[in-house]
Regions:
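N-terminal cysteine/histidine-rich coordination modules
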Residues: 231-283, 289, 294, 300
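Short, solvent-exposed secondary-structure boundary/capping segments
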Residues: 356-370
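Short alpha-helix capping/helix-loop boundary micro-motifs
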Residues: 319-326
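Residues forming the flavin
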Residues: 1-247, 251, 262, 314-317, ...
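Short beta-strand-centered aromatic/proline hotspots
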Residues: 344-358
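Residue-level "contact hotspot" at macromolecular interaction interfaces
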Residues: 289, 326-329
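Iron-sulfur cluster-binding cysteine motifs and their immediate structural context
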Residues: 258-277, 295-312, 335-337, 341, ...
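Short, surface-exposed secondary-structure boundary micro-motifs
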Residues: 205, 341-343
Length: 490
């Protein structure tokens, strides 16, 4: 602290010679190459979420998402909260890689999720007007005849992240003492970054002579918080039909436990010592039992808990669900569609109550009357007017080999494919003959895309020579070192 002076002018610089470095530079988004990927209206998830969440800009009217990881799923939900119509989501794998509770939230709001699908093209003259997707086979190749197009004005690309680790790797080649944390070390949830940051801090302290130990539990917690979600399990449906109690709609083991901490009577537990296990309710009718406070509903980030209350009417119990969209058009007495966990329609009912807990930010509790046979299946609601987006009558023809791989130098996929087919296997040679990777970003965006082209051409990674990265130190204009200020006359 104190090294950077906010009042310093642009023509000054400070040399810092640290004994130890901690790099926590985060991650950058992976790009995806397809015809039309440079059209205005094609966003990375980070830029889109910055506009919507931080700047409060309604960045689209009709949005299509490519990528079913947590980033894409959560961005889609944020778009719906902002009043943006989410037309659909395409995921190339047979199952979304993000948490199932997040995918279920989108499905319950009418978003169609197309698994085993890829994007073929974004279409439009000077901006995005539609997107064309296609089903893929086991080798992720598009299946002819399965193309379909959807009208949209925005395409959101959320196909993963790459660590910003160039500085770390280069610093280690110079034998500098460097430790990394967060996504700069490995892509994981923000909760994992908190622990990798603690570990990096202790490692740096030890490198400076501290004897403070690093608790083994920290490493164990990083492993848990960084783990991939498990396969969905069969949902446990409670058999009791008396009193009031929570029903859990989460069926996938993920590192999540806020419901256990918020219950004032400590009636929600996670078996064992692993927070990835599914929660259970331990209340006993006639004994220590749920009071229906609803705290577990509104704390759950996956909206995967409902309350079923038989106390007033056992034939038509009251079901309480958490709701996070705009409520100005939702009134007591309104008809709504009730849905199961994955968005299947169970029928229609009416809203009997709306609670707005003061302790929760923009989360309300909507109460419904549901028949006893369906009450424990209800996981959410949808306004009856909500409809899933239908594909256009005909798929839009997508373009061929002119997709831009290197945006800095405007190098197309066709140019690079041609060189690969000629026998080029060295990224440095490709850079020399095509200028791909020679731009201002230093190949940070296009390198992964070029490697993907090698894979598509069937070239093993062992045959590809990586490019030579720029030196550790950043290029600096000579005038800065001379302390010279340029004027309009220069």
């Amino acid at each position: 602290s104190g090294l950077l002076d906010r009042g310093a002018s642009a023509d000054t610089y400070t040399l810092v010679k640290p004994d130890v470095l901690i790099v926590a530079t985060g991650a950058r988004e992976r790009g995806l190459v397809f015809p039309g990927n440079t059209l205005p209206g094609v966003y990375g998830a980070g830029a889109f979420q910055t506009l919507v969440n931080r700047d409060l800009v309604r960045a689209a009217d009709r949005l299509f998402i490519v990528g079913g990881g947590n980033v894409g799923l959560i961005a889609g939900y944020h778009a719906l909260q902002a009043g943006i119509d989410v037309v659909g989501l395409a995921e190339v794998l047979p199952r979304c890689g993000g948490y199932k509770v997040h995918a279920d939230k989108l499905a319950r709001l009418g978003v169609q999720i197309y698994t085993s699908h890829t994007v073929l093209s974004a279409n439009g003259a000077d901006h995005v007007e539609s997107i064309t997707i296609s089903q893929v086979d086991a080798d992720f190749a598009a299946i002819p005849g399965t193309e379909r197009s959807f009208a949209c004005d925005t395409v959101l690309i959320a196909v993963g992240l790459n660590p910003v680790d160039e500085f770390t790797r280069k610093a280690r080649t110079y034998a500098m003492k460097v430790f990394d944390a967060g996504d700069a070390q490995a892509i994981a949830e923000a909760s994992a970054a908190m622990f990798t940051g603690r570990i990096a801090g202790r490692q740096a302290a030890q490198a400076l002579g501290s004897t403070a130990a690093i608790p083994e539990e920290w490493h164990q917690m990083v492993a848990v918080l960084s783990s991939h979600p498990g396969k969905p399990l069969a949902r446990h449906v409670p058999t009791r039909e008396i009193g009031v109690f929570p029903v859990f709609h989460c069926t996938q083991e993920i590192p999540c436990n806020p419901c256990t901490a918020v219950c004032p009577l400590q009636l929600i537990e996670i078996p064992g010592d692993d927070i990835r296990h599914l929660p259970i309710f331990t209340g006993i009718p006639g004994g220590k039992d749920c009071t229906g406070c609803g705290r577990c509903l509104t704390i759950c980030p996956g909206l995967a808990i409902t309350l079923v209350d038989y106390r007033k009417n056992q034939a038509w119990p009251t079901v309480s669900v958490a709701y996070e969209l705009a409520t100005e058009h939702l009134q007591i007495g309104d008809a709504v569609t009730i849905l199961d966990t994955e968005g299947g329609m169970l029928g229609e009912t009416t809203v009997t109550g709306i609670r707005n807990p003061q302790s929760n930010d923009h989360t309300v509790v909507v109460q419904l009357a549901a028949p006893a046979a369906l009450a424990k299946q209800v996981a959410g609601i949808r306004m009856p007017a909500t409809k899933s987006a239908a594909p256009l009558p005909e798929a839009v023809e997508h373009l061929s080999d002119d997709a831009i791989i290197c945006r800095c130098e405007r190098v197309t996929a066709g140019e690079i494919r041609a060189r690969i087919r000629e026998g080029y296997r060295d990224l440095n040679e490709l850079k020399a003959v095509t200028r791909a990777g020679m731009g201002a970003c230093g190949g940070k965006t296009c390198t992964a895309l070029i490697l993907r082209l090698f894979r598509e051409e069937g070239i093993p990674a062992t045959e590809v020579t990586e490019g030579t990265h720029r030196p550790l130190f950043v290029e600096t204009p000579l005038g800065v070192l001379a302390g010279r200020m340029e004027t309009a006359d220069d």
